[in-house]
Amino acid sequence: LNLGTAGVMYVGGITGVIGAFIYEQNATQMNTFLTILIPILSSILGSLVMGLIYSFLTVTLRANQNVTGLALTTFGVGFGNFFGGSLIKLTNSDVPSVTLTATSLAFKKSLPFASKLGWFGEIFLSYSFLAYVAIAIAIIVSFYFNRTRSGLNLRAVGENPATADAAGINVGKYKYISICLGSIIAGFGGLYYVMDYACGVWSNNAFGDRGWLAIALVIFAIWRPNLSIIGSILFGGLFIVHNYIPNLSMSDQELFKMTPYLVTIIVLIVISMLKKREFQPPLSLGLSYFREDR
């Protein structure tokens, strides 16, 4: 469980913003394909570096995973605020934010026929392509974990790395690859937040606690990617339900924003009471592997 996910999302978001900012400032004529591609590649690069840092510290140096993750989050937030503040100064804006309208419009394009399908198109087909990419990733990862040899090997590494190592599985390689790919996916989450949810506006500390919400979602989904689709819809609904309740004070709104975390705590209590193995996290979750202790 990478507690640095919030920081990785931050870095993925700001590096995507930097790529988009450079392109918007230098392009004489905006190309839709490049407008989307450059921020994505920038986000991949930034989040991949974060994944490599976490992998090196926790897999190679065997540092404490929880402490390393928290440090990575602190670093990621500071990195984002520093470079975000630098971009804000470059724009000479009167407000403390950077707005990338052209890039946001390219990312937010929905299917052209969605509006013609009534309520169905409005509910299911009116989102940007990254939303559907996220769903596809969850389905593919679920299939990979349960139906492929390498996916089963990865699960074995998470359950008992010593046994996996004895069976000839390269534990370090599997951990490095999975951490880096997971970081890239988290970076996409940060990019999606900025370009779609925030309409291309970057302001420091804008992510709030959404990175931690992603970590809570992993626990809620009981480490099953397919359940994370349902969980993300539920968490998203709980997080914004206060917008549809009239006459709520600011303090009451913050209480409603707590509900996803309360639900996660309830899920943890329930699965601990059930004591069924299929509902439990991987046995080696958060533990460093020392081959000489095998």
Name the predicted role of every residue range:
Residues 13-19, 74-81, 131-143, 182-190, ...:
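Hydrophobic core segments of alpha-helical transmembrane domains in multi-pass membrane transport
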Residues 18, 22, 49-52, 56-61, ...:
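Membrane-interface helix caps of multi-pass small-molecule transporters
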Residues 29-77, 239:
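Alpha-helical transmembrane segments within multi-pass membrane transporters and channels
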Residues 67, 93-98, 128-132, 206-210, ...:
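Loop-to-transmembrane alpha-helix initiation sites
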Residues 76-146, 251-256, 282-294:
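Transmembrane helix-bundle core of multi-pass membrane transporters
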Residues 122-201, 225, 229-230:
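Helix-loop-helix "hairpin" substructures at the membrane interface of multi-pass membrane proteins
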Residues 159-162, 166, 171-173, 245-294:
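Cytosolic-side transmembrane-helix boundaries in multi-pass membrane proteins
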Residues 186, 196-261:
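Transmembrane alpha-helical segments in multi-pass inner-membrane proteins
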